[in-house]
From Swiss-Prot:
GO terms for cellular component: cytosol. Homodimer. This is Erythronate-4-phosphate dehydrogenase. It comes from Psychromonas ingrahamii (strain DSM 17664 / CCUG 51855 / 37). Its main location: cytoplasm. Catalyzes the oxidation of erythronate-4-phosphate to 3-hydroxy-2-oxo-4-phosphonooxybutanoate. Belongs to the D-isomer specific 2-hydroxyacid dehydrogenase family. PdxB subfamily. NAD(+) binds at D147, D232, G257. GO terms for biological process: 'de novo' pyridoxal 5'-phosphate biosynthetic process; pyridoxine biosynthetic process. Pathway: Cofactor biosynthesis; pyridoxine 5'-phosphate biosynthesis; pyridoxine 5'-phosphate from D-erythrose 4-phosphate: step 2/5. Keywords: Cytoplasm, NAD, Oxidoreductase, Pyridoxine biosynthesis. Substrate binds at S45, T67, Y258. GO terms for molecular function: 4-phosphoerythronate dehydrogenase activity; NAD binding; protein dimerization activity. It is found in: Cytoplasm.
Length: 383
């Protein structure tokens, strides 16, 4: 059995060795000729899996994507050919939520505001949007959810209108790319919508680049008419409009979901799905391969406030590191993909155990940290 695997799916060799002949390929440059003898195809979001890519292959049985999003997969075509498909829903929701949290803590420090004084509209209330909501709600923010498809499907949570989205202090996008249907998301934020936003607002996009009309955004930015921008995703990746970069407060190359834990979680989900398809019992889990974080415990004696949360957060992940590196690497023609391919290891907050009082542990847990009651950890860093 020939298993073709995107070369940037982490720990794939460890998980899949023994299940067939492993062939690793560049996901950005996959071709029909290259995949002609694949029985299993494992990809990421950069590979469009459709009739064109699979036109020469007559034996493919299983396609998997190590991502939450599936808009790069022609599922109708796969179904018509009898090819089993699997994705990794929720695999990197924590990673994206922590990217948003780090970004907002940085901006709050720079602009001198308290997050609990702000309202945030979370556009998209699926796995990732919900993870963002849980963390920011724990910080006391006025969180609003906008998701018409979920509302129509009977979701019992309270949802806001799009008008209310545009009135929020902060807007964070977490919807898939939808081209057609009653609720398309491509250019959801077009020139008309963007022109309704103000300099006092913050707009974050860690979902899909096509949600925002980047050219319209640039034209407004050149006039000084945009909110503070945090962009992890861009139109026309990897060949983004670099003229937009100077106007973006925090800019990164589609790495919000790139924590080691989240990426390996996606690999494990594909591994388990393939084992189920082959009617085999899986032997491995993420814990078999991922080591402890370099900084894995800390003790705090002070009362938790926003600066302390920022300090704890940035022991694990500080988005400013990625922003600075991206602005440097994007000067190279292949810089966007190079940074993603060589992305420095980043862990999730759960890998850090915070020793604190019982009273403070609930908030820490809601933010994603592991916790222990004071004095239960012997070897810790102290803040």
């Amino acid at each position: 059995m020939n298993i073709y695997i995107d070369e940037n799916i982490p720990y794939a060799r460890d998980f899949f060795t023994g299940h067939g002949n492993l062939h690793f390929f560049s996901g950005r440059n996959a071709s029909a000729e290259q995949l002609i003898d694949a029985d299993v195809l494992l990809v990421r979001s950069i590979t469009e899996v459709n009739e064109k890519l699979l036109s020469l292959n007559k034996k493919l049985k299983f396609v998997g994507t190590a991502t939450i999003g599936t808009d790069h997969i022609d599922q109708t075509y796969l179904k018509n050919r009898g090819i089993v498909f699997s994705s990794a829903p929720g695999c990197n929701k924590v990673s994206v939520a922590e990217y948003i949290l780090s970004s907002l803590l940085v901006l709050a420090d720079q602009q001198q505001f308290i997050l609990s004084d702000k309202s945030i509209a979370i556009v998209g209330a699926g796995n990732t949007g919900t993870a963002v909501y849980q963390r920011l709600n724990a910080l006391g923010m006025n969180c609003k959810l906008y998701d018409p498809p979920l509302l129509l499907a009977g979701d019992k949570r309270q949802f806001c209108t799009f008008e209310e989205v545009l009135e929020a202090d902060i807007i964070s996008l977490h919807v898939p790319k939808v081209v057609q249907g009653p609720f398309p998301t491509v250019h959801m934020f077009d020139s008309k919508v963007l022109s309704q936003l103000t300099n006092g607002q913050i707009l974050l996009n860690a979902a899909r680049g096509d949600l925002i009309d980047n050219q319209a955004l640039l034209e407004l930015a050149e006039q000084g008419l945009t909110p503070t921008l945090v962009l992890d995703v861009w139109e026309n990746e990897p060949h983004i409009n670099q003229q937009l970069l100077p106007y973006v407060a925090i800019a990164t190359p589609h790495i919000a979901g790139y924590s080691l834990d989240g990426r390996v979680r996606g690999t494990e989900m594909l591994y388990q799905a393939l084992c189920d398809f082959l009617q085999l019992k899986g032997k491995y889990t993420t814990a078999d391969f991922v080591h402890r974080a370099a900084i894995n415990s800390v003790s705090i004696s002070k009362k938790i406030d926003q600066p302390l949360i920022k300090s704890l957060m940035h022991l694990i992940f500080d988005v400013r590191r990625d922003d600075a590196l991206f602005r440097e690497m994007i000067e190279d023609v292949d810089g966007f993909d190079t940074m993603r391919k060589t992305y420095q290891e980043r862990r999730e907050l759960s890998t850090l155990t915070v020793e604190s009082s019982v009273e403070q542990n609930t908030l820490l847990q809601l933010l994603g940290f592991s916790t222990n009651v004071q004095n239960e950890i012997k070897e810790t860093h102290e803040i």
